[in-house]
Structures are given as structure tokens and as C-alpha cells.
Amino acid sequence: MTTLSPYDSMSPVTRAAYRAKSAAADLAPLPRAAKDDALLAVADALEVRTSEIVEANAQDVAKARAAGTSEAIVDRLTLTPERVRAIASDVRDVVALPDPVGEIVRGSTLPNGIDLRQVRVPLGVVGIIYEGRPNVTVDAAALCLKSGNAVLLRGSSSAYRSNTALVRVVRDAVGGAGLPADAVQLVPGESRESVRELMRARGLVDVLIPRGGASLISTVVQESTVPVIETGTGNCHVYVDAHADLDMAVDILINSKAQRVGVCNAAETLLVHQDVAAEFLPRALAALAEAGVTVHADERVMAHAKDSGANVVEATPEDWETEYLSYDIAAAVVDSLDRAVEHIRLWTSGHTEAIVTTSQQAARRFTQLVDSTTVAVNTSTRFTDGGQFGFGAEIGISTQKLHARGPMGLPELTSTKYIVTGDGHVRR
């Protein structure tokens, strides 16, 4: 008589989730050294097997180009040997970070003599649903392993070959280092049904983190029965105040918009105080033109566009809410700082907003009134990043207020539990 495994009657996604849950239980109590050794093995394996990864990625890139995918999205999909080495370097950076598991968040001895400690513990099984950025595959795996979590990865079908190769390399390295290989799994299948099944795996998957565009995030938030940490889109604003250093403002604007356009911390809207519009806008528009940026302008910006050389088109209502992820920016003139704040409140995705000003009073009011994960004063929006904040690699940038907000590093991939120690204490 053949004995059936309990896994035999399960769908591939459910089977993967059960295996992840088992692996998470094995991973949670491991010491830092064991996890770090596994991560170092992952970094080494990525470098040794770079050609295997790049060859798989080339198939995804060719398919994307044949489908007419924009070059900005193709760039996010592409893995070169240099980019694979950078991913390996990022994994080594995670090794150098403190292990949050077991950290005592707070502790005290109660009046009755009981010792109370709140300590960090892994979340358990983390599901990541993301679009065509294969570097996320390794970043997520590294952060989850370091924080003692198992991870189920569901990337875009456009990067399926790349992700398959990356996960194969990571699993081989993790298993070879003596950790459960099932702590890192690619969700089986390329169909949308596999995504829906992952979203319904409550009780097996402890949290889902979607990374991608507004449509993806909205779908996960609305349809998931698993708790979701929402990583929002990046409709980021740069506001040039009446008291701005205009040279600084041009530099910050161009860096925020054009350094890398296909990322969530790139600026998508420029707001300019009316008192500096006549002096600032011709310079800003010329600089944007030199950077190849098309400006979607309101009528007050249009009035300053003559002889700037800028590619300026009339803004539509949709422009104010658009995360372009391209060489486009919306622009408007506002009557006051408070009007800028009103505009941001109406259209922001809650990611990052910047003010350029020499006025401490204006900076203070802006930072108090704007309710986003990051409010920047005289700095580029591009600094909203786990690496730039010193957190190491990030799992995403949360734009919600519960559990985590802003760049999510290792501590944000943990929860806490209370350890209560007594000496025969009973409650009377």
C-alpha cells in the first residue's frame, strides 16, 4: 500500500506555503552566525554563477523588447554582470547589519517582582508580490533570511526566467550552508491564479508585501485575506518656496526627476511659489529640457515657457495623480506654501515630498503639515531609500501607517512578543 504525503493533495502554491511555514519555524531560533554564513554563501554563489543568471535574464529582456515594452521598464528588468555583482555586494551589506531577532525593545521588573521583556521575533512567512525587477528577488530573500523569516516570492511573469535562476542559486547556497532551502521559494506558476491563491493563504502566510504600480498594489490590498503591508506608488513632489535658493532648487529638481526616472522616489510634480516663478521657471524649464524631460504644465507655468527650449504640454487633471516613471513631470505655480500643501494633500501617494527654502519657519510649517512617509528639506527626493537611510537593503517603502512606515529594513520585518518570568507568581 502506497502512503500518500499530506502534500500530494495540495495545489503547488499551498504546498509551497506549507513548506515555507515549516522552514520558518526552523529558521526563527537560529543564531546570527548561521544566517550570516548562509548569506555569505549566497553572495559568493551569485558571483560564481553570474553567467547562468545573465543568460536567463537575456531571454526575459528579449521577450520584453519584442512585446514593445518601454526602455525604462526594460532597464529595470535587465541584469548585467555588473548589476549581479552589485546585488551580491548588497547581500554582503545585509550580513554586516545587526540581527534584530531577540533584541529587547523594552524591559522592566514589575512591582510584584515579575520580569517583563518585549523582544523582537520574526514575522514568520512573508509573501512578496512584485513587478519586473529581478534584483528585488535577492534583496527580499536576503532581508527575510537575516530577520529569520521564510519568503514566498511572486515576481512578474516578465522576469520569470530571471527569478527562477536567481532563486535556484539562492536555494542551493542556503541549503548548502545548512539552512532550510524552503525558506526561499518562488511561487509556482506564471498565472494570475497563483497570485490569487497566495493572497488567500491566510494562516500559512503571515504578511504580504506588494511592490509595484498602483494597479498591482490596489489589487493585493482589495483581494487579499492575508494581512498586507502596503508599499505605495511614488507621486513625489518638489516645492520651490518663495525663500528658496534658486541654484539649489534647480539642482534638487533635476536630481529628483532625472537621475533615475523609473524608481518610486523620483519626483513627478514640481510646485513653484508665485513670487519666484518668473525668475526660477525659465531656468528650471531649460534644465529640464537639457535632461530630456517633458513638462506637463498648468497655464501659469506655460506663461514662462517661451524661449526655454523645454518640451511643454498642457497638463490634464490626470497628470497631477500620475506616477510617470519616465522623463515627464507635472508642474504648477501656487500662490503660497499652504496652497502647495493643499495640492500635495489632494494628489500625493504619501511617499516623499520636498521643500526647497532658506526659511526655517517655512520648512517647519511644511514638515508639520505634509503627511507623507518622508518630508525632505533642501534635499532630493531620491534619498528616500533604505540604503541611503543606513538601513541596508529594503523590502519596500511602506506608505501606510500601521506596523511600518517608510523604508522597510530588518526591524520592520519583525514583530514582538512578551516574555514574562516569575518565581511561582499567581494572580490573586
Swiss-Prot record:
Pathway this chain belongs to: Amino-acid biosynthesis; L-proline biosynthesis; L-glutamate 5-semialdehyde from L-glutamate: step 2/2
E.C. designation(s): 1.2.1.41
Catalysed reaction, written as an equation: L-glutamate 5-semialdehyde + phosphate + NADP(+) = L-glutamyl 5-phosphate + NADPH + H(+)
Subcellular location: Cytoplasm
GO biological process: L-proline biosynthetic process
Xref: InterPro entries: Ald_DH/histidinol_DH, Ald_DH_C, Ald_DH_N, Aldehyde_DH_dom, G-glutamylP_reductase_CS, Glu-5-SA_DH, GPR_dom
Single GO MF annotation: glutamate-5-semialdehyde dehydrogenase activity
PROSITE patterns noted in UniProt: PROA (PS01223)
The organism's place on the tree of life at top rank: Bacteria
Keyword annotations of the record: Amino-acid biosynthesis, Cytoplasm, NADP, Oxidoreductase, Proline biosynthesis
Cell inner membrane in keyword set: no
GO cellular component: cytoplasm
Function: Catalyzes the NADPH-dependent reduction of L-glutamate 5-phosphate into L-glutamate 5-semialdehyde and phosphate. The product spontaneously undergoes cyclization to form 1-pyrroline-5-carboxylate.
Protein family according to the UniProt entry: Belongs to the gamma-glutamyl phosphate reductase family.
NCBIfam families for the chain: PRK00197.1 (NF001221), proA (TIGR00407)
Family annotation (HAMAP family): ProA
Protein name: Gamma-glutamyl phosphate reductase
Gene: proA
